[in-house]
Amino acid sequence: MVKNEDGTYARGYKLATLRTLLDSAGLLSQVAMSAIQVHDVALCRPLLERAPVLRAGDLLLEDRGFIDGATLSHLKRKRRVDVIMPLKANMLATQEAIQLAAMADKWEAHPSRAHQRMALVCGVEHMWSECEVPLNACVIQFWNKKKKRTDHIVLVTTDRKLNASWIVRHYEERPEIEQDYEQMKSGGWQLQKLSSTRYSEVVFYVLTVVLSYSLYHLFANTPPGTRFADKTRQALAFEQLRTQRTHIIVYAGGYFEIFETLSFVQMVLQLSPPVQERLRTWLAEHLSQIQKRE
């Protein structure tokens, strides 16, 4: 349990995921879980250091909340995995990169935003004591409408072969990744909708959702599944309800029968009034019991 900024309390779990990007969306190829009070970096560090899904030559996109020089150095040195991540504004490496970009004054056009420009700055690792591997930076300059002044974003990478344009192009995949993650949490996969507090049941539910999510996106990246690539699970479920017939199962004694819903309703409407009344009474009692359990 943790205390929120507004004074309320929250209980739950934390889920860390490694996403392998495909042509459309991606697969959750590695996950880790912990109690909600565990820090994000503490949860993800073992995952990044040991996950078999990360292989030499891979490129990892990270959020600035995961800034950890030791982990970044381990990934590059021991695993030969490169990283792209934004630096915090108050870091010395950030200020160094901005000043060097201004001194060189060799700005390039941003690949996707007409009113922004960027510059490549090589060798900023000496201003970040926790980082033990060479770093290049991409300084993005833009007009901050809220602050009404020129502002900067600094992306760093351990892949020294990348130019400024490719650093930005790779990192611009992050907003789409975050949108997909929000869909997984609340969109239709209902990752946050837990019916039990038992850890074993929570783990089973989460792993089932993660596996289903990945299998869905794996299918969406095949030729037969391309028609589902740009649709959320919610949209597909709604479309299915609108266009496909539904069925119900009716039990009586030791027997059951599967009826198409409209056919079953038609059959019920053809029953004699006394039988319909008995059925109406039974349904009222049954629905009342269900509502009490919920």
Residue ranges: model-predicted function:
Residues 1, 20, 26, 44, ...:
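Short, conserved catalytic/metal-binding motifs centered on acidic residues
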Residues 1-21:
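Active-site-proximal, Lys/Arg-enriched surface segment
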Residues 32-53:
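Active-site beta-loop-alpha junctions of metal-dependent nucleic acid enzymes
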Residues 40-41, 67-72, 164:
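Short, well-ordered alpha-helical microsegments
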Residues 69-88:
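A short alpha/beta connector and helix-capping loop motif
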Residues 89-95:
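Short gly/pro/ser/thr-enriched loop/turn and capping motifs at secondary-structure boundaries
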Residues 96, 100-141, 186, 191-194, ...:
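A short, flexible helix-boundary coil/loop motif
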Residues 164-195:
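Short amphipathic alpha-helical "interface-anchor" segments enriched in bulky aromatics
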